[in-house]
């Protein structure tokens, strides 16, 4: 009623913004306690703009102003890398999403570093900025398994469960060595190792609630320095030798920036998040144009 002439799309995004503002308030005490490092609420930019760096930058700036503890998600496509630098320069704390490979995490971190250095050169404050780069570890596993299925590869199934962990540990090693100010974030859990086998670094490990319950019920005692340990050769060698897709994900130069958008794992995930936009519009439509047959 407060938006009588708004489109379904406009109403949907108004809902996203209002819900995000309300949720962000819950995290404000932790945000203040951690001086911006933690206590943030992630809000997603419109994934339909995945090829438009300016649109992503503009929306990231808009969303960052909704609350002081917003962190804004931008997908790691080829076209979006420029947005990571520019939005950072404009003071936005970013969460890089739709990200699966060491190469993507490096491109993000380098772009954010450029943005931070531009701010520093102009005397602009960065003390409360807390950028993160997600690795969708479970979707790494998923994509390697798709490749294994297509190839008819015969390997110990346990090995495939380590693909996301291996990529995360390698990226963490690179981040530590290069001193990036962006932190890694683990997302898209598929097994407890996406928590228990990547602990001990300056990273964000935040299992969804359902996984927190499972982990507690399992009573697992994690290795508190697991992220800094090398992957066993019996696991890593077969992954590198048998699965070209895994090597693209694992190697520092496995993907070129111009390959990010059309990489298989990216396309799979983009299709999912784009469908979510359609689902949001459908949800609004059921309210604004209710089905009279029900």
Regions found by a protein language model. Give the residues of each.
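Domain-level signal for soluble alpha/beta catalytic cores
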Residues: 1-12, 41, 88-92, 113-116, ...
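Short, compositionally biased low-complexity segments
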Residues: 1, 138, 142, 244-251
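Structural signal for hydrophobic packing residues in well-ordered secondary-structure cores
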Residues: 24-31, 35, 64-67, 112-120, ...
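General structural feature for long, well-ordered alpha-helical segments within catalytic domains
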Residues: 19, 23, 55-59, 83, ...
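Active-site beta->alpha loop and helix N-cap motifs at the rims of alpha/beta catalytic domains
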Residues: 1-84, 89
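Catalytic alpha/beta core domains of metabolic enzymes, predominantly
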Residues: 93-227
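Catalytic cores of large soluble enzymes that bind and process phosphate-bearing ligands
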Residues: 8-19, 23, 51-55, 100, ...
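C-terminal extensions of enzymes
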Residues: 225-294
């Amino acid at each position: 009623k407060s938006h009588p002439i708004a489109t379904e799309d406009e109403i949907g995004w108004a809902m996203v913004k209002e819900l995000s503002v309300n949720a962000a308030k819950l995290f404000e005490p932790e945000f203040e306690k951690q001086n911006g490092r933690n206590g943030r609420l992630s809000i997603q930019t419109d994934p339909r703009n995945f090829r438009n760096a300016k649109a992503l930058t503009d929306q990231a700036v808009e969303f960052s102003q909704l609350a002081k503890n917003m962190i804004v998600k931008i997908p790691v496509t080829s076209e979006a890398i420029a947005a990571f630098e520019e939005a950072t320069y404009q003071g936005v704390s970013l969460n890089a999403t739709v990200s699966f490979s060491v190469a993507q995490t490096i491109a993000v971190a380098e772009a954010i570093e450029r943005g931070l250095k531009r701010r520093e050169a102009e005397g602009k404050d960065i003390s409360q900025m807390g950028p993160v780069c997600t690795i969708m570890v479970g979707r790494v596993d998923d994509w390697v398994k798709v490749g294994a299925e297509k190839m008819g590869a015969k390997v110990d199934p346990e090995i495939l469960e380590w693909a996301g962990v291996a990529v995360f540990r390698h990226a963490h090693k690179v981040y530590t060595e290069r001193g990036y100010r962006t932190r890694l974030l683990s997302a898209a859990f598929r097994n407890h190792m996406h928590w228990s086998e990547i602990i001990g670094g300056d990273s964000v490990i935040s299992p969804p609630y359902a996984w927190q319950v499972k982990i507690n019920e399992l009573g697992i005692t994690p290795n508190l320095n697991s992220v800094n340990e090398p992957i066993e050769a019996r696991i890593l060698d077969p992954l590198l030798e048998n699965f070209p897709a895994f090597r693209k994900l694992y190697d520092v130069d496995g993907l070129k920036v111009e390959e990010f958008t059309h990489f298989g794992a990216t396309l799979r995930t983009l299709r999912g998040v784009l469908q979510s936009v359609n689902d949001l519009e459908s949800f609004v439509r059921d309210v604004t144009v209710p089905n009279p047959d029900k």
